[in-house]
């Protein structure tokens, strides 16, 4: 997995002068995006956006005399990708930008090689997004030197270590985002940006923010997405019944969560071979396992390495964690949405790695650590309490 860049492969493969309409059923209001481009050095420009029914639109138009126009139908604001001839697959490409489309007439002025500085008029959501970005701009400028080192690092593990230096900057920007959410409960920008915060929130925190929104935002596609994610998070939080699963382990043996019901406490460790914090935490996990295994603790490693099986097996050997059971998450990028909803990570509301879920002998979740839960110190305390009693 490439940790360095968000890619847009789906946007740059097979870019033809046609519009793809998938599941395009509920849109009812017209929009126009009329644009002008300076320093033009390519002939075509492209627009891609998702639609509430689950499909997407991929449109293209030819630039004539420095002008272009897109037309379509929407029933609510959506984030769209606008791009010309790209030099890379990164969203940092100089000919790529994101815009908030609304079902109204809009204009945009861009300069080839400087798409991120595009000027958009007519979209209220875009205006709100601009305000939010201006508030975070000073922090982003401070962060830029580290970000540049990160971009240029070719080793994924080293890049992940550099990425850890982002944390204080991200914390400052999170604070700005949450203040914006509180002051803009009727903004599509709030619901859209909330999608990127779910990994750091527990179900109560996420629900509190969601409940502050207007009905209009709750009923938007972004609002419905957040509601569904909160439900998944609740399913993987203390007090909920642990979702059942069954899979072949690393040795080809069938493993089912139900095998341990009534017999052992189970700690599910959601991790991956490429996850530096996961790997750094393995020595501590080994000490926990050795301390409590005879008292009735079982660990199950669930790895997000379905496309890197060899790396998964190598990491288990290198980190000496083959002493407990290991399975893959079951991820398949070609699966249907219904099939994806059955993934172990999805059923437990896993948004970030590492995350650990502690399950008692009755199959009830009694702890969540990392990824919207408590820290490892709380996990250690909980385990000590359990096994001092038992």
Walk through the language-model features, giving the residues of each:
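Structural microenvironment flanking redox-active thiols in thiol-disulfide oxidoreductases
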Residues: 280-322, 333-344
């Amino acid at each position: 997995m490439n940790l360095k860049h968000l890619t847009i492969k789906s946007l740059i493969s097979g870019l033809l002068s046609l519009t793809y309409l998938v599941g395009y059923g509920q849109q009812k209001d017209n929009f126009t995006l009329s644009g002008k481009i300076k320093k033009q050095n390519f002939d075509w420009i492209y627009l891609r956006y998702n639609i509430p029914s689950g499909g997407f639109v991929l449109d293209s138009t030819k630039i004539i005399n420095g002008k272009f126009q897109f037309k379509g139908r929407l029933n609510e604001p959506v984030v769209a990708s606008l791009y010309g001839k790209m030099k890379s697959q990164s969203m940092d490409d100089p000919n790529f930008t994101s815009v908030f489309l609304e079902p109204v007439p809009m204009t945009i002025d861009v300069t080839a090689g400087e798409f991120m500085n595009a000027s958009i008029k007519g979209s209220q959501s875009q205006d709100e997004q601009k305000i939010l970005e201006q508030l975070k701009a000073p922090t982003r400028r401070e962060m830029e030197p580290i970000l540049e080192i990160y971009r240029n690092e070719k080793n994924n593990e080293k890049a992940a270590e550099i990425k850890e230096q982002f944390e204080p900057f991200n914390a400052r920007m999170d604070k700005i985002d949450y203040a914006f959410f509180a002051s803009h409960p009727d903004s599509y920008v709030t619901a859209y940006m909330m999608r990127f915060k779910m990994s750091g929130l527990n179900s109560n925190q996420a629900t509190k923010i969601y409940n502050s929104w207007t009905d209009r935002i709750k009923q938007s596609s972004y609002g419905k997405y957040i509601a569904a994610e909160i439900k998944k998070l609740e399913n993987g939080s203390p007090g909920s019944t642990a979702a059942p699963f069954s899979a072949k382990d690393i040795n080809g043996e069938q493993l089912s969560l139900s095998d341990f019901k009534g017999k052992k406490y189970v700690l599910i460790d959601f991790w991956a071979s490429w996850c530096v914090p996961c790997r750094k935490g393995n020595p501590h996990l080994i000490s926990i396992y050795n301390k409590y295994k005879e008292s009735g603790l079982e660990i199950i490693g669930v790895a997000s390495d379905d496309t890197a099986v060899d790396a998964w097996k190598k990491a288990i050997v290198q980190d000496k964690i083959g002493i407990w059971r290991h399975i893959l998450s079951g991820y398949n990028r070609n699966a249907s949405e219904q099939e994806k909803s059955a993934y172990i990570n999805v059923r437990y509301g896993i948004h970030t790695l590492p995350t650990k879920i502690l399950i008692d002998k009755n199959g009830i979740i009694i702890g969540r650590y990392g990824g919207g839960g408590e820290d490892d110190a709380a996990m250690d305390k909980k385990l000590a309490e359990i096994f001092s009693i038992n």
